[in-house]
């Protein structure tokens, strides 16, 4: 796994802030239900809380790209496959529930026959909107954040617990609240498995499953009005389907892994072995980077010292060639001139060599772990590498010019003597 995720502190703070804002807003928005005049089984105003909390977290915290990784709206073959499952699984749950009602209660309740006073299209649109705003916050945003440090299964458990607390209903007693908690947790676990390995394309799948479940339950069961048997049947049916679907998915992936011998990362991108050594890998990467910087600086220092030695040898060889040029013309005055010039060359060479060595030593003694210091050291090293080469070229050209001038002067003197 690539370590391009958010830090552990921001990860924990994002989850905490999202949950606190969601719960606080759900309490504050309850009073607006009666103000807007919309019935709660059409659109629940408190469901806006996860959407608002997600937007606030995106604006407040950094690493926007990581936070928005679960909010992709593109379509793939896997998304189409999961969309079909998002329609089939609610149908299976409703069939199990209706069969249970017919077996244990002799009938199931149709709310439409007991006084729904709004068109079905209004209910459908309202439930699609509710599903979108809730799943935008919990699945497309929160689950994506949690999965940066956990695998999909455990991330679904964490998000499922938070979603169950958010959806808790204590109005009709403790037993009703317990079965409602089981229902919402199983509901969330199914959704977590449905959006697994979709690479951020979660909103279509989550919205379809959520809207299908709530829309069907409104017409077939009376849990909305506090019927204990209804919520019990719904909770147990959803839990059975959740266990069966997740278990079957794990078995299929296990068989595929054993038979094809594919890499576990290829088979399941966010698997159980991910995120185990995230902190260790990060520390190891930083240590390797620091040691490589130290080695590079040491090698550069050695290269600078060797370059200084080469420059010194080139200068000595250039100076040593000067007597042979001057001996061809005159033996007295040129030798005296060459001697003085050699002494000055050695003095200048000594100065340049000492300066280059000092620059190499300063590079070795500079802090190796700081990236900004390494950049400045590299500039100094490049400058020190350029100075000996430039000096060598300047000295060669100056020696040639002096030799040409001396030859011309000697020729003039010899011509004067001949005259």
From Swiss-Prot:
GO terms for cellular component: plasma membrane. The chain crosses the membrane at residues 9-29, 41-61, 84-104, 118-138, 153-173, 175-195, 202-222, 231-251. Residues 372-382 have a biased composition (Acidic residues). It is a multi-pass membrane protein. Keywords: Cell membrane, Cell wall, Membrane, Secreted, Transmembrane, Transmembrane helix. One of its GO terms (biological process) is CAAX-box protein maturation. GO terms for molecular function: endopeptidase activity. InterPro entries: Rce1/LyrA-like_dom (IPR003675). Residues 273-419 are annotated as: Disordered. It holds the Pfam family Rce1-like. Coiled coil: none annotated. Residues 282-299, 323-336, 344-353, 383-419 have a biased composition (Basic and acidic residues). It is found in: Cell membrane; Secreted, Cell wall; Cell septum. Interacts with N-acetylglucosaminidase SagB; interaction is direct and facilitates peptidoglycan processing. Interacts (via N-terminal region including transmembrane domains) with sensor protein kinase WalK (via N-terminal region including transmembrane domains). Interacts (via N-terminal region including transmembrane domains) with sensor protein kinase SaeS. Interacts with other histidine kinases, perhaps via their transmembrane domains. Involved in bacterial cell envelope homeostasis. Regulates peptidoglycan processing by N-acetylglucosaminidase SagB, perhaps acting as a scaffold protein. Pleiotropic regulator of gene expression, probably acting via interactions with multiple two-component systems. Plays a role in the abundant deposition of the immunoglobulin G-binding protein A (spa) at the cross-wall, a subcellular structure that initially arises from cytokinesis. Belongs to the LyrA family. This is Lysostaphin resistance protein A.
């Amino acid at each position: 796994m690539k370590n391009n995720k958010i830090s552990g502190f921001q990860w924990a703070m994002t989850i905490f802030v999202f949950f606190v804002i969601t719960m606080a807003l759900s309490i504050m928005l309850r009073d607006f239900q009666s103000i807007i005049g919309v019935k709660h089984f059409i659109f629940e105003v408190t469901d806006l809380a996860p959407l608002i909390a997600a937007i606030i977290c995106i604006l407040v915290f950094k690493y926007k790209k990581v936070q928005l990784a679960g909010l992709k709206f593109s379509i793939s073959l896997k998304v189409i496959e999961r969309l079909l499952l998002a329609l089939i699984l609610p149908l299976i749950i409703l069939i199990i529930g209706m069969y249970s009602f017919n077996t244990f209660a002799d009938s199931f309740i149709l709310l439409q026959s007991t006084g729904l006073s709004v068109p079905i299209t209004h209910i459908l649109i309202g439930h699609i909107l509710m599903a979108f705003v809730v799943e935008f916050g919990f699945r497309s945003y929160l689950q994506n954040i949690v999965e940066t440090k956990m695998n999909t299964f455990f991330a679904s458990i964490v998000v499922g617990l938070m979603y169950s607390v958010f959806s808790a209903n204590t109005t009709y007693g403790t037993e009703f609240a317990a079965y409602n908690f089981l229902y919402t947790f199983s509901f969330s676990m199914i959704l977590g498995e449905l959006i697994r390995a979709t690479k951020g394309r979660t909103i279509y799948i989550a919205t379809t499953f959520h809207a299908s479940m709530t829309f069907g339950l409104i017409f077939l069961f009376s849990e909305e009005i506090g019927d204990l048997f209804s919520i019990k049947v719904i909770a147990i049916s959803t839990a059975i389907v959740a266990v069966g679907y997740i278990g079957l998915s794990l078995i299929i992936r296990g068989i595929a892994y054993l038979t094809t011998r594919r890499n576990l990362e290829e088979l399941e991108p966010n698997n159980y072995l991910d995120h185990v050594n995230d902190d260790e890998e990060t520390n190891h990467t930083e240590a390797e980077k620091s040691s490589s910087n130290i080695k590079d600086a040491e090698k550069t220092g050695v290269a600078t010292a060797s370059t200084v030695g080469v420059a010194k040898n080139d200068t000595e060889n250039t100076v040593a060639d000067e007597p042979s040029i001057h001996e061809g013309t005159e033996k007295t005055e040129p030798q005296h001139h060459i001697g003085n010039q050699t002494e000055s060359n050695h003095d200048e060479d000594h100065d340049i060599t000492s300066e280059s060595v000092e620059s190499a030593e300063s590079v070795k003694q500079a802090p190796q772990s700081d990236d900004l210091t390494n950049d400045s050291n590299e500039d100094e090293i490049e400058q020190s590498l350029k100075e000996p080469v430039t000096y060598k070229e300047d000295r060669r050209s100056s020696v040639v010019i002096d030799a040409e001038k001396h030859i011309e002067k000697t020729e003039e003197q010899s011509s004067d003597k001949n005259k």
